[in-house]
Amino acid sequence: MSETSLLPRAHGAAVLSAAMRSTPDDFQVDELPAFEPSGEGEHLLLTVCKRGQNTAYIAKKLAHWAGIAEMGVGYAGLKDRHAVTTQRFSVHLPKRIAPDIAALDDAQMQVIDSTWHNRKLQRGALHGNGFVLTLRQVHGERDAVEERLQAIAARGIPNWFGEQRFGRDGGNVAAALVMFGYVQAADGTLAPAPTSRRRLRNDQRSMLLSAARSALFNRVLTARVEQDSWDSALEGEAWMLDGSRSVFGPEPWSDALAERLACFDIHPSGPLWGAGALRSTDQAAAVEQGALSDPQSEALRQGLEAAGLKQERRALRLRPQGLDYRWLEAQTLQLEFALPPGCYATAVLWELGEVTDAGRFDAGVRSDE
């Protein structure tokens, strides 16, 4: 069963069913840059529109084109294979002599801009991502769909980690348990894993650690949604500043905090598990600990702590920016919005209803998405 298939909906029951990604053009993602290029330096900054290929493939292609090692190519984030996406890449060219850029253009990618910059593009160096999603075969009452979209724009949504984090049927979480020394039986019980486990590459290990952490966060967020406190304050709340990773509190509830919460300047937060004490206290901490008290969650917690990860926080609430919609046909709905880095468009769709993804990835431990 998928880690995301039974998540609760904060705004009520589903109001539609639909199909997504019937073609790559139905899922368009534009990276929102975090900085202006310097125009100088030895890193060629390329803005690339790609179709039907993942970010790692394009990075390898650029390295081959430039005649450099793959580590000389930088990008801010991974973009989906089954989509039309626009993002930046940096290519290290110390002599500032670039091969023919036009030679890169083909059916899979086109370079739409190029300039120079004085440093390599680092992961996370983006303001966010803009999405244009086209849903087809939409079934549901139009008034109910539009009312739900308006509610999402006004109140926001739970900041779920999307299915991409967990692999097919949540397989990455099961693989993380094996990495931590456990196997899970069909009845949910845990047993020691065989000692002759295969050695994982660093990227595989990192992906499984992320899956374990994300699963625990979603379980805490599930508890908060079920008690309708995902966008409100509990005693002992640790607060996250909107648009940053800065965390403060707990502190006594006040009119000032209430105003900041209402205008989306701050959000309640949940744990990204690791070693160390929870930042939250009192009621908020009790909810977090209670949501993660089952044997599987305890095994994941212990594994993350042993792996050396430290306690961090993630906002429980997310508000899509500039949410707009238009009906292209009677059963075709186009959505447009922007999200901060690390947030999932599928979390927006989940609040609408059951959306079947025709371009569903195969994200096991070998996934490069």
Curated annotation (Swiss-Prot):
Domain of life the protein comes from: Bacteria
Keywords of this entry: Isomerase, tRNA processing
Enzyme Commission number(s) of this protein: 5.4.99.27
Catalyzed chemical reaction(s): uridine(13) in tRNA = pseudouridine(13) in tRNA
UniProt cross-references to InterPro entries, sorted A to Z: PsdUridine_synth_cat_dom_sf (IPR020103), PsdUridine_synth_TruD (IPR001656), PsdUridine_synth_TruD_CS (IPR020119), PsdUridine_synth_TruD_insert (IPR011760), TruD_catalytic (IPR042214), TruD_insert_sf (IPR043165), TruD_pseudoU_synthase (IPR050170)
A GO molecular-function descriptor: RNA binding
Active site: 80 (nucleophile)
Domain TRUD: residue ranges: 156-318
Entry-linked NCBIfam families: PRK00984.1-2
Record function comment: Responsible for synthesis of pseudouridine from uracil-13 in transfer RNAs.
Family per similarity comment: Belongs to the pseudouridine synthase TruD family.
Record's protein name: tRNA pseudouridine synthase D
Provenance organism: Xanthomonas oryzae pv. oryzae (strain KACC10331 / KXO85)
